[in-house]
UniProtKB/Swiss-Prot annotation:
MF terms in GO: dTDP-4-dehydrorhamnose 3,5-epimerase activity
Assigned protein family: Belongs to the dTDP-4-dehydrorhamnose 3,5-epimerase family.
Annotated catalytic residues: 63 (proton acceptor), 133 (proton donor)
Organism per entry: Salmonella typhimurium (strain LT2 / SGSC1412 / ATCC 700720)
Name of the protein this chain belongs to: dTDP-4-dehydrorhamnose 3,5-epimerase
Length: 183
C-alpha cells in the first residue's frame, strides 16, 4: 500500500509506503507494478535500475535525457538522506521552469515519481547516502543533457550553506535556456 502526496507540480508525486515494523525490524513493499500504475494513472515500464553512493554535500544533477530517450524515474534513498529535486523542462507545460524538492531518506522511506520531461538532481544531506532509481528508458549518452544546479531562472532553494561538491561535468552545465536549445 502506498500513500500519494501531491506536489506543487501535479505530475511529480511523493509515494509513501505502508511500513510494518516491530522489535525485529521492518518490512514494506517498495514497488508493485499494478499499484504504481494505478497511482500515477498510466502504464509504465521500467527498463533500468541504478544505484549510487555519495558522500555529504555531493550534488548530482540536474540531469535529463532528450526526445525519444527521455526517462521517467522512480527514486528513493535506501541509506542516509538526500534533498531530491525535479525541474519541469517541458516547454509547453504551465509549470515549465518550476521545481519541487523533497527530503528522501532511509528513515521516511518516501519515493519520488519524476515523469519524462523533467531534469533531476539531488544533494546528500547525511554523511553519505545510497540512492536508488528505476528508469523508464535506457541511458543514452547522445541524448543526455544537464542544467546548472544554481540557475537563477529556476531558483532552487538547496538546503546547504557551503558550495556543494560537483563533478566537472555538472559544474560546467549550461543554464536552462541554453540547455534546451538543442531540443
Amino acid at each position: 500500500m502506498m500513500i500519494v502526496i501531491k506536489t506543487a507540480i501535479p505530475d511529480v508525486l511523493i509515494l509513501e509506503p505502508k511500513v510494518f515494523g516491530d522489535e525485529r525490524g521492518f518490512f514494506f513493499e517498495s514497488y508493485n507494478q499494478q499499484t504504481f500504475e494505478e497511482l500515477i494513472g498510466r502504464k509504465v515500464t521500467f527498463v533500468q535500475d541504478n544505484h549510487s553512493k555519495s558522500k555529504k554535500n555531493v550534488l548530482r544533477g540536474l540531469h535529463f535525457q532528450r526526445g525519444e530517450n527521455a526517462q521517467g524515474k522512480l527514486v528513493r534513498c535506501a541509506v542516509g538522506e538526500v534533498f531530491d529535486v525535479a525541474v519541469d523542462i517541458r516547454k509547453e507545460s504551465p509549470t515549465f521552469g518550476q521545481w519541487v524538492g523533497v527530503n528522501l531518506s532511509a528513515e521516511n522511506k518516501r519515493q519520488l515519481w519524476i515523469p519524462e520531461g523533467f531534469a533531476h538532481g539531488f544533494v546528500t544531506l547525511s554523511e553519505y547516502a545510497e540512492f536508488l532509481y528505476k528508469a523508464t528508458n535506457y541511458y543514452s549518452p547522445s541524448s543526455e543533457g544537464s542544467i546548472l544546479w544554481n540557475d537563477e531562472a529556476i531558483g532552487i532553494e538547496w538546503p546547504f550553506s557551503q558550495l556543494p561538491e560537483l563533478s566537472a561535468k555538472d559544474a560546467a552545465a549550461p543554464l536552462l535556456d541554453q540547455a534546451l536549445l538543442t531540443e
